[in-house]
């Protein structure tokens, strides 16, 4: 099963540098903290609609090429992050199988728990970069994060109902 928003997310084109945008947009696109937390600060009840969670081969995560170690399998999680039941963000997390050892195994068992609830409570979380992307109409971003030094790639597409717009 897929979702049209995930097709748009995969179509994002990334800027080589941070573009000159309105401060309001940059505030959302360059947020270092949890997007889940930001949505909750808007007074919303945040929930996850799980689209897909599975091991996939490298051909299904081509956007990770050069950004993550080359491995035969990756854990892929695709979700919609909803605020009061309305989708505000599409998310796609790609985790190399080698990252899923030790406490990071929990990434395979998040289910309907927002990723941010786990990531941003970890004292071992670091972020290598944020890249801003855009398709024809929507903004997005991707980040390489590390848990205990082990990488994962998070891509987020802000949907039309999101307060980013």
Swiss-Prot record:
Subunit structure: Monomer.
Family annotation (Pfam families): Chor_lyase (PF04345)
Its biological purpose: Removes the pyruvyl group from chorismate, with concomitant aromatization of the ring, to provide 4-hydroxybenzoate (4HB) for the ubiquinone pathway.
Gene3D superfamilies xref list: Chorismate lyase-like
Residue intervals passing through the bilayer: none
Enzyme Commission number: 4.1.3.40
GO biological process: pyruvate biosynthetic process; ubiquinone biosynthetic process
Name of the molecule in the record: Chorismate pyruvate-lyase
Family of this protein: Belongs to the UbiC family.
Lineage of the species this protein comes from: Bacteria, Pseudomonadati, Pseudomonadota, Gammaproteobacteria, Enterobacterales
